[in-house]
Amino acid sequence: MFQYAQSLVQALSSIDGRDVEVIVAYGDEAWRSELDASPLKAVPLQHWKRGETLAKLFMALPGSVARVVARWVNPLVRELATLQCDLWIFPAQDALTWQMREPAIATIHDLMHRYERSFPEAGSWLRFQLRESRFRHLANQSAAVLVDSETGRRHVMESYGTPDDHIYPLPYIAPNYLTDSVETSAFAERYRLPEKFYFYPAQFWPHKNHLRLVQALAAARTTHPDMELVLAGSTKLEYAAVKATANELGLSQAVHFVGYVPDSDLAGFYRHARGLVMPTFFGPTNIPPLEAMVCGCPVLISDKYGMREQCGDAALYFSPQSVEEIHGAMSRLWEDEDLRSSLIKKGLERASLWKQEDFDHRLREILGRVLDRVA
């Protein structure tokens, strides 16, 4: 979500001064340095924490009631009202979106609590109820909804009956820091990567499917004993279970756990990897395939939801349920140089079709339509 918000801020910078004034209001201090480098007017919010807490509590109320109550009770709503904006954009699925006095554009990144309810991080009883309340309000109480893809648009329409003309696909783009980063000798010394490897950057949530990936690696190594895998992500969630499985399968030297990787180092992994392998169950789309393509790294990915919409013919696809299909794709790319060259070329071409300037242009179109409707 942070990367999507970064893309929005950059896009709004290209709009500011063109018959509109853009103000960025923020509560998280992580945004301070980001906005210091932006030409946009940035306003730190004094009541962010309390206001966010109240907004979440008001999720239990009907949307119209929550809006009335928030005007009187929530100091953050009153603080934002003093900025006298005609339209707000909330990029992080915020509960505050439908509680504002002014029209607001919501963002819905995914509805996996509905489509992949077997995973506790999205579909446990409590998590489902909280997400369902939030997203139903976002879909039906906002002036418009941003989604990542046509698949995301369809999910919102199927789930909540939101009118088609209120939902606007605004796909993710790869972060600029990937193409701007310069690799130094310190990178090689810090990570000591194998000469040839697959890469998967993901926190160890069950839906990220690390366990099947490790099992697929074990199967692939029966014919490709030099195949190795590098996993990036903090040592939480299913990390211990994944590491234990790797050890049980005799892969302690073939699976490399590098922990959290800062943004400044991420491009180095993509550039050195044989390919990105991403067996996730969640979508509709994801940012890592975009990162890989822009860095010239082939993509192997789950054939789920909007993945084909995002990657087209620039990826190899497999069922995330099937260890056999995952290791089949990994084995196919491991030795086939022509295939790898073809995927790199197609990935770079696909990445060139949707860049920051395209994102900027699409956002201007969306804002024009929404402002015309709410004026």
Name each model-derived stretch.
Residues 1-375:
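Carbohydrate transferase catalytic cores enriched for Leloir-type hexosyltransferases
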